[in-house]
Amino acid sequence: MQSYNTFKGPDGDFNYIDWGGSGPLVHFGHATGFCAGTYTPIAEKLCHRLRVLGMDDRGHGRTTAEANPRNLKNWNTFAEDLEQFFDHLREPVIAIGHSRGAVAHLLLAVKRPDMIRALILIDPTILPFSWMWWWYLAKKTGFARRIPIAARAGRRNPFWPDTETILNTYRTKQPFRSWERGFLEGYIEDGTTPSDSGGIRLCCTPEWESRCFSVCPHDIWRYIPQIRQPTLVLYGAASDTFLAPAVKRFQAKVPHAVIRRFDRTSHFVPMERPDETVEAIFTFLQEKGLLSGA
């Protein structure tokens, strides 16, 4: 049975889910706009051989720590929050992260290698190296706020009359309509909260989600060659996020990394291919001697 718990950070409370399970300790980091509960279907599969936790990042889910978009300068904030949480756990973890959650774990793995035993990056938000100068200028000039993904997030409707309405609406839209059952339901259950004006609202505000996208790291490639942990990268062949030039450069910079592509799969690998994702994770951990038993 999963349980909801609170970690008290220096500037507020962080919610995390303990899905249970036995075996090595795992933390599963979520993508921007979502929450830990979104990944409950895959976390429950991982629990067959692992102990799985997932924290709602600042500005997401049930976490109530301060989330002022004006104060968010980069994704180091999320890595620092993870550092506080992992210090609270008092045990190194196998770090699994999706999208921005993958990058937050990567940043912490380089800063605090003692905290992370292995790094599993699922379609990480790592832009091609050739884009970095342009992205740096976009951030400096404020143009980053106007890129399509940030602009769309900023216009997102956060208010809904009830969970049934938002579920029925989202089921017909991409990316949700390609997700396996349970992921969207987990997102709506833990990613919405009662609104003061009636109905429900998204926990991750449009302003915060947009800001997260617009401060995506422009210097991530300086950290990638410093990865020393056993590393697995899973990505979708149809991803619009982890593109072929980035895949190729990542392999060159981290030659010990195991990289696997999922055909006919988008950025949302865990939601579209949960069984294959779990199988790939178990196989990797077994081969690295980090998973015992059959």
Residue ranges and their predicted role:
Residues 1-29, 47-51, 69, 90-92, ...:
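Alpha/beta-hydrolase fold catalytic core
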Residues 18-67, 85:
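Conserved HGGG/HGGXW glycine-rich cap/lid loop of the alpha/beta-hydrolase fold
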Residues 29-31, 98, 235:
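The conserved beta1-alpha1 loop
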Residues 57-96, 135-138, 279:
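Active-site loop/oxyanion-hole signature of alpha/beta-hydrolase fold enzymes
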Residues 91-134:
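Conserved hydrolase catalytic core segment
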Residues 131-196:
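Helix-rich cap/lid subdomain of alpha/beta-hydrolase
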Residues 182, 189-252, 261:
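Conserved serine/cysteine hydrolase catalytic core
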Residues 262-274, 278:
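Catalytic histidine-centered segment of alpha/beta-hydrolase-like enzymes
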